[in-house]
UniProtKB/Swiss-Prot annotation:
Pfam families: Phage_holin_3_2 (PF04550). It comes from Escherichia phage P2. This is Holin. Belongs to the P2likevirus holin family. GO terms for biological process: viral release via pore formation in host cell membrane.
Amino acid sequence: MTAEEKSVLSLFMIGVLIVVGKVLAGGEPITPRLFIGRMLLGGFVSMVAGVVLVQFPDLSLPAVCGIGSMLGIAGYQVIEIAIQRRFKGRGKQ
């Protein structure tokens, strides 16, 4: 496995672990669909941090992982809220 592949996998796992922690700490009931969906969304949103390497190719892995953590925490919630609003808007029509 190359260093780039390890970086992408690290970012994905960071996002997944952040979401697992948030789901387990939250008060809402956990369903398998919700759990798996949020894990995938958090993982893929964290992987977006790899785009930073295009602008800053010499950025260290801990810095990229920090950006991935930030996106994993805030990014998936923004996307989830946008999706919920979109589907609620369709239901009212």
